Amino acid sequence: MNAPVKILNPVGLLAELTHRCPLACPYCSNPLELDSRAAELDTAAWIKVFTEAAELGVLHAHLSGGEPAARRDLVEIVAHCASVGLYTNLITSGIGLTQERIKALADAGLDHVQLSIQDAEAKSADHIAGYEGAFARKQSVAAWVTAAGLPLTVNAVIHRANAERAGQMVKLAVALGARRVEIAHTQYYGWGIVNRAALMPTKAQADAAIAEVEALREVYAGVIVIDHVIPDYHARHPKACMGGWAKRTLNVTPTGKVLPCHAAETIPGLEFWNVRDHSLRDVWFASPAFNAFRGTEWMKEPCRSCPRKEIDFGGCRCQAFALTGDANAADPVCHLSPDHDKVAAIAAHANEEEAATEIAYVYRGVKAPVPAE
């Protein structure tokens, strides 16, 4: 038997304030069954969550959704996070933000903004987002963010429809005044797995996009930081998902369920505790879902005897379940997995000529109107 797993305090909290969103991105990682507005935590409950997070040692509060700007109490939430010493990062589509609201958020103590873009070309970007005018609106929001003195990161998800413009998206981020850009190839969870056939690029597309972005590191050294999340379907080893299950971060859903990762609900049989019934401290240290895949005792072969088991932790549990039906199995991305042929077949299909044509998206459900000020 291995020694008991040492559980350190978390450093990050992803707060999904709402699932409401005016966009309908086909790669959205939100669950297929979206939480309703009526079921969301109220302001007082979220304030309690952030207070407990700070007491637990959390340093960073990532305010996400859906679209967090759909919450009328967003400024109040940011002000409270600042008052308890949390660094706040707003992850937003920009839709629902005005120049006045951004200034109010900055005055309340907001530390950072991450703004998503869907492409470097307006027509394609709006098509991907399922929202006409989104591209133009995001450029205005970026200008308002930098005018308010807030540091800006631009996020771009790469897939078949925009892979040829990965480098242009880096250049767009520079033009928008961002200090950092995250170029992330699609991770297939939530709506992303529904749309995998439409989203997955060919290997040639992925390789070209990766090379283009990597070449820009030297071009823009000292100008912008480039974070690059490459696709794992063409890799030999799996990603160290979340840095290991329930090791660094936790996620609170709009209704108060606390998850080890945003896709954990896709694994059946896990018991998720809710902030309405338990403190964050109790959830982090004692909840069954958080302890399900901590350490290495749960691992099967080939992970159990693998020298990389403390490096990639067997890969992603959610992906393992999605592709094998067994959350304890090795992530099939790994070339040592007995199920690796499933990943290879999916990647090979993306390379076939008939699969490389445009496939209609199944857009993310439940589009909410932009909230009134």
Curated annotation (Swiss-Prot):
The keyword Oxidoreductase applies. The keyword Protease does not apply. GO terms for molecular function: 4 iron, 4 sulfur cluster binding; cyclase activity; iron ion binding; oxidoreductase activity; S-adenosyl-L-methionine binding. Binds 1 [4Fe-4S] cluster. The cluster is coordinated with 3 cysteines and an exchangeable S-adenosyl-L-methionine. It holds the Pfam family SPASM. Catalyzes the cross-linking of a glutamate residue and a tyrosine residue in the PqqA protein as part of the biosynthesis of pyrroloquinoline quinone (PQQ). Keywords: 4Fe-4S, Iron, Iron-sulfur, Metal-binding, Oxidoreductase, PQQ biosynthesis, S-adenosyl-L-methionine. Its cofactor is [4Fe-4S] cluster. GO terms for biological process: pyrroloquinoline quinone biosynthetic process. Residues 7-227 form the Radical SAM core domain. Interacts with PqqD. The interaction is necessary for activity of PqqE. This is PqqA peptide cyclase. Belongs to the radical SAM superfamily. PqqE family. It catalyses: [PQQ precursor protein] + S-adenosyl-L-methionine = E-Y cross-linked-[PQQ precursor protein] + 5'-deoxyadenosine + L-methionine + H(+). Its EC number is 1.21.98.4. Pathway: Cofactor biosynthesis; pyrroloquinoline quinone biosynthesis. [4Fe-4S] cluster binds at C21, C25, C28.
